[in-house]
UniProtKB/Swiss-Prot annotation:
The gene is EIF3H. GO terms for biological process: formation of cytoplasmic translation initiation complex; translational initiation. The keyword Protein biosynthesis applies. HAMAP family: eIF3h. Disulfide bonds: none annotated. Residues 9-19 have a biased composition (Gly residues). This is Eukaryotic translation initiation factor 3 subunit H. Component of the eukaryotic translation initiation factor 3 (eIF-3) complex, which is involved in protein synthesis of a specialized repertoire of mRNAs and, together with other initiation factors, stimulates binding of mRNA and methionyl-tRNAi to the 40S ribosome. The eIF-3 complex specifically targets and initiates translation of a subset of mRNAs involved in cell proliferation. It is found in: Cytoplasm. PANTHER family: EUKARYOTIC TRANSLATION INITIATION FACTOR 3 -RELATED.
Length: 348
């Protein structure tokens, strides 16, 4: 279900980009160095997941705003409605047109600047997300994808990150050549596939005053639940997902090693054929006969098709994401452990 929804995001990206490209480009053509998000957008994304997100099913939506110099300002958003395969009459392009027309009538920013998606235990580095973001970023250079992690957020801190495809990966995706030689030539590794853009959440002055008043009213006892260490399920699930991706990587390595063995075997066969051919020509020349005609050796020995390596890079990137999440999670729990111990000693 997640992959189907991600794939539909790619179609929406192409439409939204074509609608907003000209207007967005007038505000600034430089690369995005910061993403500024209104607090209302964050609340809408969280509300969307709470209403429609279930288990590992992701929710997605469109980000609206504008580009100012090297800063991308996200001022509003709207969700993609959940629908099943049976909803054949649903037209996502028409849905986006109607939403943007309605927003324009009430004088709200209606230019597409990217999209958002929830994630399940950090599982977002997929081919579907890559294709969707490429569709957006190819049409509007400043487009970003926001990844919201509801499970991390439930642990006590908002988890919202903005990502873009690196220029190197954009060039490779344009060429659509994901062979080992092409990725090696472009110097593409999982570390430089995505770039994270810093996020700043901005609220109005009235909202800041209200938050300050709420913070003064909240008692210290209300926050003790944030020191809870009952999180073995989260760690266990993350480790299980990590092991699954490692198994996939192991299978992919076996396939690639098989390809390398086949290439090496064919090279040996070509070398042996050339040696036999050369010896036959020498014998024919000694008998005064004409040498054998030259043949296209590549037609006789068709090279094996190299496997695409993009999936391997995505799996490696996902493994790295899981490792970073586990590292951060354990660091937070260690901090909670020391704080809980200090609080207990203080109360005693």
């Amino acid at each position: 279900m997640a992959s189907r929804k991600e794939g539909s995001g790619a179609a929406g990206g192409g439409f939204g980009a074509s609608k907003g490209k000209g207007k967005a480009a007038t505000t600034g053509d430089s690369a995005v160095k910061q993403v500024q998000i209104d607090g209302l957008v964050v609340l809408k994304i969280i509300k969307h997941y709470q209403e429609e997100g279930q288990g590992n099913e992701v929710v997605q939506g469109v980000l609206l705003g504008l580009v100012v110099d090297d800063r991308l300002e996200i001022t509003n958003c709207f969700p993609f409605p959940q629908h099943t395969e049976d909803d054949a009459d649903f037209d996502e392009v028409q849905y986006q047109m109607e939403m943007m027309r309605s927003l324009r009538h009430v004088n709200i920013d209606h230019l597409h600047v990217g999209w958002y998606q929830s994630t399940y235990y950090g599982s977002f580095v997929t081919r579907a997300l890559l294709d969707s973001q490429f569709s957006y970023q190819h049409a509007i250079e400043e487009s970003v994808v926001l990844i919201y992690d509801p499970i991390k957020t439930a642990q006590g801190s908002l988890s919202l990150k903005a990502y873009r495809l690196t220029p190197k990966l954009m060039e490779v995706c344009k060429e659509k050549d994901f062979s080992p030689e092409a990725l090696k030539k472009a110097n593409i590794a999982y570390e430089n596939m995505f770039e994270e853009v810093p996020i700043v959440i901005k609220n109005s002055y009235l909202i800041n005053v209200m938050l300050w008043e709420l913070e003064k009213k909240s008692a210290v006892a209300d926050r003790h639940e944030l020191l809870s260490l009952a999180s073995s399920n989260h760690l266990g699930k993350s480790l299980q997902l990590l092991m699954d991706r490692v198994d996939e990587m192991s299978q992919d390595i076996v396939k690639y090693n098989t390809y390398l063995r086949n290439v090496s075997k064919q090279q040996q066969q070509k070398h042996q054929y050339q040696q036999r051919r050369q010896q036959e020509n020498l014998q024919r020349q000694s008998r005064g006969e004409a040498p054998l005609p030259e043949e296209d050796i590549n037609k006789l020995f068709k090279p094996p098709q190299p496997p695409a390596r993009m999936e391997s890079l995505l799996i490696a990137g996902q493994i790295n994401t899981y490792c970073q999440n586990i590292k951060e999670f354990n660091a937070q729990n260690l901090g909670k452990l020391f704080m809980a111990q200090a609080l207990q000693d203080y109360n005693n």
